[in-house]
Amino acid sequence: MGVRKRISAEKRKESRRTMYFARLRHIPVSARKVRLVADMIRGIEVFKALGILRFSNKKISLFLEKLLKLAISNWEQKTGRQAENGELFITMVNVDVSTILKRIRPAPQGRAHRVRKRFSHVVIFVNTKNEIQN
């Protein structure tokens, strides 16, 4: 490994230590539907967001609730502190398109129509309010 590559890898590794996130990949829900719920919780305190997700009637809210709990536990594990009410906030929610599974459905007159089953990736970043402002 070259010197410049090693230095940039060390910088990336160091910046990842101060980021607290959780990633969920290949969710069987389209990214468009995920963004509807992700927009509801972006920038909100984590325990309030858990309440919003718990009482949402969307399928994706179950996945996002588990993912948010995982992000909170990652923050607790990296910092060594317990998350208190009003301390931890969702800084960023990234929703990306994943693979598309293509199926064929029979159609009239011997034809076939494509059915596209869409998947998505979600990353949730959490941090304390005073670290967000710095």
Swiss-Prot record:
GO terms for molecular function: rRNA binding; structural constituent of ribosome. GO terms for biological process: translation. Keywords: Ribonucleoprotein, Ribosomal protein, RNA-binding, rRNA-binding. InterPro entries: Ribosomal_uL22, Ribosomal_uL22_bac/chlpt-type, Ribosomal_uL22_bac/org-type, Ribosomal_uL22_sf. One of its GO terms (cellular component) is cytosolic large ribosomal subunit. SUPFAM superfamilies: Ribosomal protein L22. It holds the Pfam family Ribosomal_L22. Part of the 50S ribosomal subunit. This protein binds specifically to 23S rRNA; its binding is stimulated by other ribosomal proteins, e.g. L4, L17, and L20. It is important during the early stages of 50S assembly. It makes multiple contacts with different domains of the 23S rRNA in the assembled 50S subunit and ribosome. Belongs to the universal ribosomal protein uL22 family. This is Large ribosomal subunit protein uL22. It comes from Azobacteroides pseudotrichonymphae genomovar. CFP2. The lineage of its organism: Bacteria, Pseudomonadati, Bacteroidota, Bacteroidia, Bacteroidales.
